[in-house]
A protein has these predicted regions:
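A conserved mid-protein helix/loop that constitutes part of the nucleotide-sugar donor-binding site
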Residues: 20-25, 203, 207-229, 245-252, ...
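A short helix/loop element that forms part of the nucleotide-sugar donor recognition site in Leloir-type
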Residues: 50, 80, 186-199, 204
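A short, active-site helix/loop in glycosyltransferases that binds the activated sugar's phosphate group
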Residues: 148-176, 182-184
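Nucleotide-activated donor-binding/catalytic signature segment of Leloir-type glycosyltransferases, i.e.
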Residues: 251-267
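Aromatic "clamp/platform" in nucleotide-sugar-dependent glycosyltransferases that forms part
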Residues: 268, 287
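Short hydrophobic beta-strand element within catalytic cores of glycosyltransferases
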Residues: 304-307, 317
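Conserved acidic donor-binding segment of nucleotide-sugar-dependent glycosyltransferases
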Residues: 319-320, 324-331, 340-346
Length: 388
């Protein structure tokens, strides 16, 4: 690494999720120009995920780095990270996600010696939708303090950047937008309606989500109940692709809303994207979403998308052309937009065609606009800018 500038990435854990996969992709793309180090805490997926790294990347497991709050382990992780920064003397420390962002930035500040340039990618904010007001205020205060130890921030979308700057997380000149890279190739074996138990005459409306409160699936179910009551002549199937802690409560809610025969719960599916071709309309009812990969995957397959008007979701559709955005936690507004698409097959087709063109468009260099290659090129351009 002696003949190249060194970039040290720090992420809380390597798991089978978007932020981890994008960080791994970025590490691989940076090896021709940089010595690359990736430090992460332990996780059951870490061994498999680390195998995706090219051999040129120096992978370091930080034993005490974990997502959960633990003062003793957090202090140990901070000291471990400080020691690695002192040993490696990186030119750039690039932190990812909240916990690694906090400890990594503090470690860089405390390491002494030559100060690295500190870049932080939150991979979405936690300003609303996750916690109550007191806990959110504490997180916000902590992030404002940490902003003093941050040279540059990276947002996934203009919406994330705007909302972060509005609450005092850094200054606008410190922020750049670099979207997550999304693989929008069509699935090798696309699902058909019959594969999910959907009759040909039924309008399939679906969502892909971890079943936890911030994903807003409760409002998807309540919108489904409104549609069934208000439009008894339309035949719907509502598909929830994903598993999680709320699967049981959501199944019970579906029963209470008399949706037992109308809603399909697939549970966790590793091939979630392959199920999207069975749908007619895609819905993302999240209470907060940094960017939203699934709406892009759905649009790339020609589906119009209805999304919540939160953080980065409005940035991944074209309002009124490829889909609609609605206020969060508003089942009525969600139902109205779904109904508009359900009643008009021609509108669905036109929006679906526009959605496919939008999702699969190229950037100024001819790369897929939402792909990993475009993401990595923008990140490398930022590194070149900040190192002069």
């Amino acid at each position: 690494m002696a003949d190249k500038p060194v970039v040290m990435h720090i992420i809380t854990r390597l798991e089978a999720g978007g932020s981890s996969r994008n960080t791994i992709d970025s590490c691989g793309a940076q090896t021709p120009d940089y010595g690359v180090v990736l430090a992460a805490g332990p996780h059951p997926d870490a061994v498999a995920m680390a195998k995706l790294l090219p051999p040129e990347v120096n992978y370091i497991e930080v034993p005490h780095l974990q997502r959960e709050l633990s003062p003793i382990k957090d202090l140990r992780a901070l000291l471990e990270l400080r020691r690695q920064i002192q040993l490696l003397q990186p030119d750039i420390v690039h932190t990812h996600t909240s916990k690694a962002g906090a400890l990594g930035r503090l470690a860089a500040a405390l390491a002494g010696g030559r100060k690295p340039v500190v870049v932080h990618t939150p991979h979405g904010h936690i300003l609303y939708g996750y916690y109550g007001p007191v806990k959110t205020w504490i997180f916000l205060l902590a992030e404002r303090i940490l902003a003093r130890f941050t040279d540059y921030f990276i947002a996934l979308t203009p919406g994330e950047m705007r909302e972060s700057v509005e609450v005092g997380l850094g200054r606008a000149p410190q922020w750049r937008v670099v979207h997550s890279g999304v693989d929008l190739k069509p699935p090798a074996v696309p699902a058909h309606k019959r594969d999910l138990g959907i009759a040909e005459g039924e309008i399939a409306v679906g969502t892909v989500a971890r079943l936890e409160p911030v994903k807003g699936v409760e409002y998807f179910l309540r919108a489904a109940a409104l549609l069934r009551a208000n439009r008894p002549g339309l035949k719907f199937k509502f598909v929830i692709i994903g598993g999680g802690a709320l699967e049981g409560p959501l199944r019970r809610l579906a029963g209470q809303l008399f949706l037992d025969q109308t809603v399909i719960f697939t549970g966790h599916r590793a091939d979630a994207a392959a199920l999207l071709p069975a749908l007619d309309i895609y819905v993302q009812p999240s209470l907060n979403e940094g960017m939203g990969r699934a709406p892009l995957e759905a649009q790339a397959l020609g589906l119009p998308a209805v999304v919540s008007r939160v953080c980065g979701l409005p940035d991944v559709i074209r309002e009124g052309q490829t889909g609609y955005s609605v206020p969060p936690a508003d089942a009525g507004a969600l139902a109205i937009s779904i109904e508009k698409l359900a009643l008009d097959a021609g509108l669905r087709a036109r929006m679906g065609a526009a959605a496919k063109a939008w999702a699969l468009a190229t950037d100024e260099a001819g790369r897929p606009r939402w792909g990993a290659e475009s993401m990595n090129a923008r990140l490398l351009a930022l590194y070149k800018e900040i190192l002069g």
